[in-house]
Regions:
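Histidine-centered metal-chelating micro-motifs
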Residues: 70-72, 78-79, 121, 128-141
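Glycine- and acidic-residue-biased ligand/ion/polar-headgroup-sensing regions
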Residues: 66-67, 84-105
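Asparagine-centered strand-capping/turn motif at beta-strand->loop junctions
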Residues: 142-146
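A short beta-loop-beta micro-motif enriched in histidine and acidic residues
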Residues: 50-60, 71-91, 119
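Double-stranded beta-helix
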Residues: 98-127
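Conserved small/polar residues in nucleotide/adenosyl-binding loops
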Residues: 151-152
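A short, N-terminal "cap"/entry segment at the start of jelly-roll beta-barrel domains
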Residues: 1-59, 114-116
Length: 152
């Protein structure tokens, strides 16, 4: 990713954190990750992250989804003899469409199908203040709601 692209997305993410009322230290502001998984399609498959802690068992992050961005489908697998991580999504700003293993049909979702393989369509809609926890080894993907921006 070009430095110019990285800096552009960091600025957008910091603006979103501010709109969401999330106070960040200077160290945190300088540690924003811009994630595109090497796909070079950040406007569609990507997100911006501030990581507060990330160990083998626990992780705490604030994630920004900008207009049009989707976090690709994945699961948290066992690592080093430990089961995969639980993950709790708490919507802080905007709306988040979370798709997890369970009943659901791709023709019935409120979001849009990203240009990558997705196989789970059980839809959980999160509004500010709402949260949902998934267990280890649960397939999931997520994207911002109708205004196409979200902080989770």
């Amino acid at each position: 990713m070009k430095r110019e692209t990285y800096e552009k997305y960091v600025k957008k993410a910091l603006d979103m954190y501010e709109k969401a009322g999330i106070a960040l230290t200077e160290k945190e502001k300088n540690s924003v990750e811009v994630v595109d998984w090497g796909l070079d399609n950040l406007d569609v498959l990507g997100l911006e992250i501030i990581t507060y802690i990330n160990t083998e068992r626990v992780c705490a992050k604030e994630m920004v989804l900008l207009p049009g961005q989707t976090c690709a489908e994945h699961m948290h697998v066992p690592t080093n003899g430990q089961e995969g991580k639980e993950e709790t999504f708490r919507c802080r700003y905007g709306k988040c469409y979370l798709y997890v293993t369970g009943e659901g049909n791709k023709d019935d979702i409120q979001g849009y199908i990203p240009p990558t393989d997705v196989t789970v369509f059980h839809e959980v809609v999160l509004n500010p203040g709402e949260q949902y926890t998934i267990m280890p080894e649960t397939w999931h993907w997520f994207q911002a709601g109708p205004d196409r921006k979200s902080v989770v």
